[in-house]
């Protein structure tokens, strides 16, 4: 699958814009293009990873893979209820608590708090638990493991992958952290820095 991205904005000519162009030999900043060849066609996969530095095009590429909006881990939470009541409210209780534990949110008192009062890391993991329980057919998650410390990120990536592989659906994770690759064991990886892709053997 080839994903093409082209962003365009006005070519500004303010004093500062002109000075930046002159000082740094930058003709303009109004065009940004990227073409990425993702190894997804003909591959039976569940987890894909797009990795690269900030500004390398991960979000732009990810938002075009399925033609659907990026899954928002932080939207749609009821601030008047604990997160354990917000995740799959009509679903199985054990599936919800199992998902919370599986994504690394094992601090049970946090389950009894509403989403807005959680830490950034807890919010991220609660969002992953909701994703696991909702189990959409296809989803793209941006900033995967960006707001949690690196050791928890590695273990959490492995735990998420193990949980996700138990069910159906395809998920593409976007991350600036290369250290999660061996823990996540994705079916394919696209590196925005090297413009390369690899599928798992």
Residue ranges and their predicted role:
Residues 195-201:
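Conserved small/polar residues in nucleotide/adenosyl-binding loops
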Residues 13-15, 23-29, 65-126, 130-136, ...:
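ABC-family P-loop ATPase nucleotide-binding domains
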Residues 47-49, 138, 170-172:
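Residue-level preference for the first positions of well-ordered beta-strands
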Residues 160-173, 177, 181:
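Conserved catalytic loops of ABC-family nucleotide-binding domains
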Residues 6, 34, 40-105, 176, ...:
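ABC ATPase nucleotide-binding domain signature region
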Residues 1-42, 78-79:
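Pre-NBD coupling/linker segments of ABC/ABC-like ATPases
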């Amino acid at each position: 699958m080839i994903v093409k991205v082209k962003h365009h904005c006005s070519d500004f000519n303010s004093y500062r814009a002109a000075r930046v162009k002159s000082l740094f030999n930058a003709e303009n900043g109004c065009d940004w293009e990227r073409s990425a060849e993702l190894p997804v066609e003909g591959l039976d996969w569940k987890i894909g990873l797009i990795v690269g530095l900030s500004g390398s095009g991960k979000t732009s590429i990810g938002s075009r893979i399925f033609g659907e909006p990026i899954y928002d881990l932080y939207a749609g939470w009821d601030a008047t209820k604990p997160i354990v009541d917000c995740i799959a409210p009509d679903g199985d209780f054990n599936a919800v608590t199992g998902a919370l534990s599986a994504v690394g949110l094992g601090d049970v008192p946090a389950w009894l708090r509403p989403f807005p009062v959680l830490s950034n890391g807890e919010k991220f993991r609660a969002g992953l638990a909701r994703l696991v329980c909702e189990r959409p057919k296809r989803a793209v998650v941006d900033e995967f493991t960006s707001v949690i410390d690196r050791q928890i990120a590695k273990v959490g990536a492995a735990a998420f992958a193990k949980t996700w592989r138990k069910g159906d659906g395809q998920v593409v994770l976007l991350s600036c952290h290369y250290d999660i690759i061996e823990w996540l064991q994705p079916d394919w990886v696209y590196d925005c820095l090297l413009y390369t892709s690899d599928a798992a053997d």
